[in-house]
Every structure is written in C-alpha cells, then in structure tokens.
Amino acid sequence: MNGRDMMPACARIAAADPAMADRMWNTTTDDDGRDLVDERMRGKGRMLCAACPMRLDCISRALVNGWKDKAVYGGLEYASRWTLARLIARDLHIADGGLHRIPRSRVRDWLAEHPDWAERMRRDGRDYWRRAKRRQRSRREYATDDPLFLPTEPVPKGLVQGSLF
C-alpha cells in the first residue's frame, strides 16, 4: 500500500481539482463577493466523508480548534458540529465551549467509543430546539378572550315577534 492509497478522498480531490473541492467542502465566492454553497456537491462531499477512514480525525480537529465557518469537516457543517460539541462536553463534564482546552485525542477517543454519536447528535439537536420553542412559547403573552356581553335593552311586555310575510 502506498501513500496515495492512504490519502483521504478530500485531499485527492483537492490535489486534482481545487475548485471542485471548494464546492464540495467549502464555499465559493460569486462576482458580488457573496459566499455560495453548492448543496448538490456538498451532498457528494458528505457521502465521501461518511466512508472516509479519517473522518473522526477531521471531526475532532474541527471541534477542538472551534472553526466557525461554513466549511464541512468530517461531513458536518457548523450547526451540526456545535450540537456534537455540546453533546461531547456534557458527557465529559466540561463547559460547552471548553473542548478547545482538552487534547484532540480525547475527543477522537470519545467519538470512537460512541459509534452511535450521529444518532445521539440528531436526537440532542432535536431536543434542544424543542426545549427552545417551549421556552419561547412559555414567555409569550396570550390574550384572554373575554366573553362579549353587549348591553341590551329589555323586551317590552306583550311584544311578540310578528311574521315577516
């Protein structure tokens, strides 16, 4: 086995076609200077990351270094990395933003010890947003619907509704 076989797919693609690698794992800039994301190519990049043997290394490096950009590392975008970082920090009993204080190998070992981390991450992200929405709804002021009692005049005695025709 030579060194080329050990090279991850993202590095091989970046060496052959850097523009394609940017579209798969990073952003491209249009003429106006805005960052563009090619979702179709990102999907292909995520598929390559899912099969990559170095995926846990990429994820642990991104989590410990705290990269806050629009790039994809190990198949995860920033929001997913943030959710995973919270999950790992809670499990390791450190502050949410404290992953940069621990060795990268410890984060990688945690990922290797918990092969169900992707499902736990999805569940944790879903639960987080559920709690946030409940908190938001609990703070909302609701208008109470008071019954509408309009002032009325008493009916005169002896008056009966007549026929219309």
Annotate each language-model stretch with its function.
Residues 88-165:
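Short flanking/linker segments adjacent to small metal-binding domains or redox-active Cys/His motifs
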Residues 1-9, 14-53, 64-68:
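Immediate flanking context of iron-sulfur cluster ligation sites
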Residues 35, 74, 124-128:
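Helix-centric, low-specificity signal for extended rod-like, repetitive segments
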Residues 8, 71, 162:
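A broad, low-specificity signal marking well-ordered, structured residues that form hydrophobic/aromatic
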Residues 5, 10-13, 74-109:
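Short Fe-S-cluster ligation motifs
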Residues 44, 55-73, 78-82:
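Iron-sulfur (Fe-S) cluster-binding segments and ferredoxin-like electron-carrier domains
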